[in-house]
Amino acid sequence: MPKIHDSSCTSGLTPSQRSHVLAEALPWLLHYRDKIVVVKYGGNAMIDDELKRAFAADMVFLRAVGARPVVVHGGGPQINMMLDKVGLEGEFRGGFRVTSPEVMEYVRMVLFGKVGRELVGLINEHGPYAVGASGEDAGLFTAEKFQPEIEGELVDIGRVGSITDVDPTSLFDLIDAGRIPVVSTIAPDDDGLVYNINADTAAGALAGALDAERLVMLTNVPGLYTDWPNKDSLVSSLTPAELEELLPTLDSGMIPKMTACLDAIHNGVKAAHVIDGRVPHSVLLELMTEGGIGTMISSESYEH
């Protein structure tokens, strides 16, 4: 059965939590040494200045202790602001952004030119560590047009794609050089048309291709709820089989994240985590403490 989370672990970074990080960190520091950790950067952590800096510091910390972090990001709020600024109406169908060729140019500009560059800059305030990349670079991602089924019919939503292939060679080169790749989720198809890729999906696919130790998803909730909005239903850990059983019952916004976690695990990732990006240093609190602060999906007998 899924393990229910102690909600007291979801508060902010208190002095007690800091002391626990110090006391519990050693075995986890050893565990993650030379291991790849893919982190999907999203939610409030992307728009709050304090959280942005805390996240960047977490990535530098992981690198400093010998782990190999890779960041994958989207940029929904920033894209919305840009489209509003230039007078383009943001249209959604079935929860998916309709992405015309004109909108795609702004998506590309915002993801790689704004969101990615900003995070690279924040990380590099600590040293020359981060390098920006996109799915277009060195064949990292190959995509095809994605058409969702809405009310029983396939719908054309423009330049929205799904990943058909991942070639992580260029990222391995960066990782081996001690860099922190920051990946924007845009990708070309075989004909060179560029598509916007769901960042959750891209992070899951990339984690599998990199043979990552962990996949970490930042969200705006403390973790996975089996009965949203019942806060007592927050789950601390569960197996892939348990998650597959729960998947059809979950809130629609959580399904892409959970599907990406399952895909990553099915492709060899040891464990996936869904955490609250509104908590400063949430990545370290999840990975470097015994209890963690979010939800872990793993078929192995890891402590959280």
Swiss-Prot record:
Name of the protein in question: Acetylglutamate kinase
Entries under PANTHER family matching the protein: N-ACETYLGLUTAMATE SYNTHASE (PTHR23342), N-ACETYLGLUTAMATE SYNTHASE, MITOCHONDRIAL (PTHR23342:SF0)
Function summary: Catalyzes the ATP-dependent phosphorylation of N-acetyl-L-glutamate.
Swiss-Prot/TrEMBL catalytic activity: N-acetyl-L-glutamate + ATP = N-acetyl-L-glutamyl 5-phosphate + ADP
Family in the record: Belongs to the acetylglutamate kinase family. ArgB subfamily.
EC number: 2.7.2.8
Metabolic or biological pathway, per its Swiss-Prot or TrEMBL entry: Amino-acid biosynthesis; L-arginine biosynthesis; N(2)-acetyl-L-ornithine from L-glutamate: step 2/4
Biological process terms in GO annotation: arginine biosynthetic process via ornithine; L-arginine biosynthetic process
InterPro entries named in the record: AceGlu_kinase-like_sf, AcgluKinase_fam, ArgB, Asp/Glu/Uridylate_kinase, Glu/AcGlu_kinase, NAGK-C
Gene that this polypeptide is encoded by: argB
Site label Transition state stabilizer, positions: 40, 257
Pfam families: AA_kinase (PF00696)
Record's subcellular location: Cytoplasm
Chief site of localization: cytoplasm
